[in-house]
């Protein structure tokens, strides 16, 4: 027993002795009396109180010594202190000896209860000694159990702490020798403080501890990213790979096995994750790079180990991908593959069911097999053929797709039919049939997931029972197919149109606003109008279409071009990020659509495609036997038709009987003046108060559907009777095309191809060109000798549709000959521009009658062998030896021997000096030009006589008489 414990025990005994002085005897021993249990309990309580008060007294002294030690003062016990300790120890020993003597003397007198109390005190004293002896080796400041904490109050805790500190200091002083120093005690105290703080940290609440660590180890600096932090985006340059990143290797493999190898490497890494993990980080492949897979690893040896035992791959043929090519290689591209999930439509690529539509029912665990639902093709053995060996010959014709029939299978091929799991499940020839459909497993490579495009008749085969419950909504599918076709065609290319206001959604240029300039398949060129960086304003940027979003304002009138609300129009009432809420014009309800599915609509019915484009605006349709009309407005599920009676009717597409397609020849009428009117002619109402005018759109019997640019209602279309209008201009009239200045004549560089020939053209005031729908022959140019039909014509040119080539050409009218009853008549002659018989000169100014004058003078070059109506040896137009209109021999114009216009041998131009020389001379003998000798006598082209000089030859030339007024 230590001296400290002896001190406490002795003092406690002394207190007990003094409290019971009356019980002492002369021999110095206590007088023990018989007491009941209550007295014994009271004495024990008093003992405990005395012990507690003694401990408090000593705790005060130990507290003072502890404060001195914490201030760094190391006190060594003095001689007086040591003597005090020794004396207290001796006193304790003496007291113990006295107690033992008293106990021996009074053993017989003490009852069993007192012995038990003493035993309990000794046991508790031993326990206390053992617990205090370990104070130097355990953390005396550790917290006790929760039960003890509940029992102890704050005062008891402080008292216990001070007592234990006092005991520890006392023990330290007791065990101290000369070698101990103040530094060692200070170091021991610091260790205990560190352990105490660590224990407190471990006992803290998890949330408090996490907040403490966050505040302790948080970053004290941030990386500057400019304005991108405020906008919520990160610059792509900060995400660029570097040489510190793991390397990527391109491994060559068998083409077509890329995805299979990636899947196998993934399974291998997952299998060896615990026993012998692979050190590869990533495995991927790109559809655009056939025959390669890519593995990311820190060491090449890890790739060799991962590829050990793999087939269809060439492990030695690997390439290190440069770091600068990482972004292009790792760029996220939308895969063209369709994710295979139950319920999607696919097509089979091999076997009896090649190109048949199927529905995915389930997938295998390895992902390589697909269980599909098909409409079976069975003939139940009715068309089976067998060879000599009894083997079945496969039929070359495929049976039509029909649902499985149990009756036919039992009737024709019952030996191969077995019952399956379920009331309508069967196994026929090793294949499973349920509810009439075939359920069969196919390899993944035998499944086509792209460009499936199911047809309505194929989908109808999968429809069973109630369409609302088990079947398919064919109407919805048809609408989706229509929308799909529209989006794949014009829809995709027209999602963004030049002039649209757009905003960049993501990337480095996010929040940039611009205007679309041009579009391509996947890229849009915009002109920046608003940007956070002023240097980009008014600059052109090329942005992927997926990164753009259309911008609209509240109040814009828009039209939906894609989705289930396609072709609906409405008014924008709210913009919510990428979505727009609009009020539909048709249903008067709010509709939410994606902003890129909208375009601005100028008219509610413009460009509306109803019933797949069967009808369009301004079409002439027939509603019933007696009612026809023109479509003036088209909505999603109805049309507005202006009838021939002038009534506006709203009809469904099913209410339209047919579309009237009348030829131009059938659409002809006469106006109130009796003039012919046709489609395209401009007419004006002469009866009524409105006096409307416009171009004829359709003609049906006596009703004219006219389109006016001055009327806004019904797309500018109105209807009237043909007898109420008069023709202003016709479609092919020159007047209608020459109301403005003729720019061709104002330009000196543009001249008519043949001014002389066109001088005889007469300006038409009304009616169509005579060449329209005539068969013509091309006389000159690259198409010389080809025939065709004139489809259009103006004052100079004609457009011809060739017979031999399905081609239209444009040629001048003067180079054409009109075919009339097999005879080719030149154009100028066809239009009646010639001045008289035998004269093809269109103007009628040179030769013959000039300016409506009588033909008294021979032609300009007549006489001799001249062709322009001259006589000579060859009579012209029935003439004899004389020239045009000359006398003598056989006259050509006037015939016989009778001279023309009383002229005998004299001149035809009023003269009487026949036989004289021409050109006013009288001494010209016989000239060759028109002489009596055959072919000019002895002179040609004047012989010895030249143009008025008569030396030799016959008579004068130029009409056998005096010409131009000579005698």
From Swiss-Prot:
Any Pfam family: KOWx_SPT5
GO MF, one annotated term: histone binding
Organism superkingdom: Eukaryota
Subunit organization: Component of the SPT4-SPT5 complex. Interacts with RNA polymerase II.
Disulfide-bond pairs as recorded: none
InterPro entries in the record: KOW, KOW_Spt5_1, KOW_Spt5_2, KOW_Spt5_3, KOW_Spt5_4, KOW_Spt5_5, NGN-domain, NGN-like_dom
Claim: Nuclease is one of the keywords in the record: no
Positions with biased composition (Basic and acidic residues): 64-78, 169-191
Function field: The SPT4-SPT5 complex mediates both activation and inhibition of transcription elongation, and plays a role in pre-mRNA processing. This complex seems to be important for the stability of the RNA polymerase II elongation machinery on the chromatin template but not for the inherent ability of this machinery to translocate down the gene.
UniProt record similarity statement: Belongs to the SPT5 family.
GO CC entries: DSIF complex; rDNA heterochromatin
Biased amino acid composition, Low complexity: 839-852, 914-961
Identification of the protein by name: Transcription elongation factor SPT5
Compartment annotation: Nucleus
PANTHER family the record matches: SUPPRESSOR OF TY 5, TRANSCRIPTION ELONGATION FACTOR SPT5
Keywords: mRNA processing, Nucleus, Transcription
Feature: compositional bias, Acidic residues: 96-123, 140-159
Biased composition regions of type Gly residues, renumbered to the chain: 869-897
UniProt biased composition (Polar residues): 79-89
Gene this protein is translated from: SPT5
């Amino acid at each position: 027993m230590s001296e400290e414990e002896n001190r406490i025990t002795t003092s406690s005994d002394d207190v007990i002795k003094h409290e019971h002085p009356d019980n002492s005897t002369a021999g110095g021993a206590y007088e023990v009396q018989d007491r009941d249990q209550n007295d014994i309990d009271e004495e024990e309580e008093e003992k405990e109180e005395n012990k507690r008060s003694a401990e408090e007294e000593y705790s005060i002294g130990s507290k003072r010594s502890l404060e001195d030690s914490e201030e760094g003062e190391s006190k060594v016990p003095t001689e007086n202190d040591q003597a005090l300790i020794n004396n207290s120890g001796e006193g304790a020993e003496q007291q113990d000896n006295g107690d033992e003597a008293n106990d021996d003397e009074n053993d017989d007198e003490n009852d069993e209860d007192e012995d038990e109390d003493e035993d309990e005190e000794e046991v508790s004293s031993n326990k206390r000694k053992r617990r205090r002896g370990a104070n130097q080796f355990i953390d005396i400041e550790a917290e006790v159990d929760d039960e003890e904490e509940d029992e102890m109050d704050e005062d008891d805790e402080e008292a216990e702490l001070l007592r234990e500190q006092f005991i520890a200091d006392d023990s330290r002083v007791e065990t101290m020798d000369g070698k101990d120093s103040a530094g060692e005690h200070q170091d021991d105290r610091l260790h205990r403080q560190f352990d105490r703080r660590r224990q407190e940290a471990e006992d803290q609440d998890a949330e408090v501890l996490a907040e403490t660590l966050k505040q302790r180890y948080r970053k004290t600096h941030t990386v500057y990213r400019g304005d991108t932090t405020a906008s919520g985006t990160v610059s792509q340059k900060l995400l660029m790979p570097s040489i510190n990143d793991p390397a990527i290797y391109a491994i060559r493999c068998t083409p077509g096995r890329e995805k299979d190898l990636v899947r196998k490497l993934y399974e291998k890494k997952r299998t060896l994750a615990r026993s012998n993990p692979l050190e590869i980080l990533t495995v991927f492949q790109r559809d655009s790079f056939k025959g390669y897979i890519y593995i990311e690893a820190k060491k090449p040896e890890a790739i060799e180990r991962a590829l050990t035992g793999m087939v269809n791959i060439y492990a030695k043929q690997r390439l290190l991908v440069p770091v600068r090519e990482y972004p292009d290689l790792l760029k996220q591209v939308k895969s063209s593959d369709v994710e295979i999930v139950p319920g999607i439509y696919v097509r089979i690529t091999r076997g009896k069911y090649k190109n048949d539509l199927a529905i995915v029912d389930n997938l295998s665990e390895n992902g390589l097999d697909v269980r599909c639902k098909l409409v079976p093709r069975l003939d139940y053995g009715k068309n089976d053929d067998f060879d000599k060996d009894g083997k079945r010959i496969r039929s070359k014709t495929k049976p039509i797709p029909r649902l499985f029939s149990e009756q036919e299978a039992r009737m024709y091929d019952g030996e191969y039919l077995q019952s399956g799991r379920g009331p309508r499940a069967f196994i026929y020839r090793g294949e499973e049939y349920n509810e009439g459909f075939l359920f069969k497993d196919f390899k993944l490579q035998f499944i086509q997931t792209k460009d499936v495009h199911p047809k309505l008749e194929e989908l109808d085969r999968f429809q069973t029972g109630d369409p609302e419950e088990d079947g398919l909504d064919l109407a919805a599918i048809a609408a989706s197919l229509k929308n799909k076709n529209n989006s794949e065609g014009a829809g995709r290319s027209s999602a963004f149109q030049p002039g649209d206001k757009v905003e960049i959604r993501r990337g480095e240029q996010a929040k940039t606003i611009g205007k679309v300039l041009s579009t391509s398949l996947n890229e849009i060129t915009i002109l920046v109008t608003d940007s956070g960086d002023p240097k980009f304003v008014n600059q052109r940027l090329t942005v992927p279409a997926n990164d753009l979003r259309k911008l609209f304002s509240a109040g814009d009138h828009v039209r939906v071009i894609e989705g289930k609300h396609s072709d609906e129009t409405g008014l924008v009432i709210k913009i919510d990020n990428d979505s727009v809420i609009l009020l539909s014009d048709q249903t008067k309800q709010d509709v939410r659509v994606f902003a890129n599915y909208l375009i601005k609509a100028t008219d509610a019915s413009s460009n509306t495609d109803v019933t797949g484009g069967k009808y369009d605006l301004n079409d002439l349709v027939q509603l019933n036997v007696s009612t026809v009309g023109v479509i003036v407005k088209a909505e999603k599920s109805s049309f507005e038709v202006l009838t021939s009676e002038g009534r506006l009717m709203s009809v469904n597409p099913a209410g339209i009987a047919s579309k009237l397609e009348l030829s131009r020849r059938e659409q002809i009428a006469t106006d109130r003046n009796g003039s012919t009117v046709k489609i395209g002619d401009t007419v004006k109402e002469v009866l009524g108060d409105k006096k409307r005018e416009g171009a004829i759109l359709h003609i049906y019997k006596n009703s004219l559907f006219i389109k006016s640019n001055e009327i806004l209602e019904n797309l500018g279309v109105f209807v009237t009777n043909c007898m109420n209008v008069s023709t202003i201009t016709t479609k092919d009239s020159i007047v209608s095309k020459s109301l403005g200045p003729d720019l061709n004549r104002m330009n000196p560089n543009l001249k008519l191809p043949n001014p002389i020939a066109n001088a005889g053209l007469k300006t038409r005031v009304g009616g169509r060109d005579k060449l329209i729908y005539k068969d013509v022959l091309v006389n000159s140019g690259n198409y010389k000798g080809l025939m065709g039909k004139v489809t259009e014509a103006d004052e100079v040119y004609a457009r011809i549709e060739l017979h031999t080539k399905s081609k239209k050409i444009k040629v001048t009218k003067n180079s054409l000959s009109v075919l009339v009853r097999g005879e080719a008549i030149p154009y100028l002659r066809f239009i009646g521009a010639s001045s008289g018989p035998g004269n093809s000169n269109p103007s009628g100014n040179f030769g013959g009658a000039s300016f409506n004058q009588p033909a008294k003078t021979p032609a300009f070059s007549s006489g001799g062998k001249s062709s322009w109506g001259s006589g000579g040896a060859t009579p012209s137009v029935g003439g004899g030896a004389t020239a045009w209109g000359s006398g003598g021999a056989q006259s050509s114009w006037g015939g016989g021997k009778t001279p023309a216009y009383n002229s005998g041998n004299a001149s035809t131009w009023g003269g009487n000096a026949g036989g004289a020389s021409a050109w006013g001379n009288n001494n010209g003998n016989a000239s060759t030009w028109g002489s009596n000798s055959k072919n000019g006598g002895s002179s040609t082209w004047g012989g010895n006589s030249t143009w008025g000089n008569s030396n030799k030859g016959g008579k004068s030339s130029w009409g056998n008489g005096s010409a131009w007024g000579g005698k």
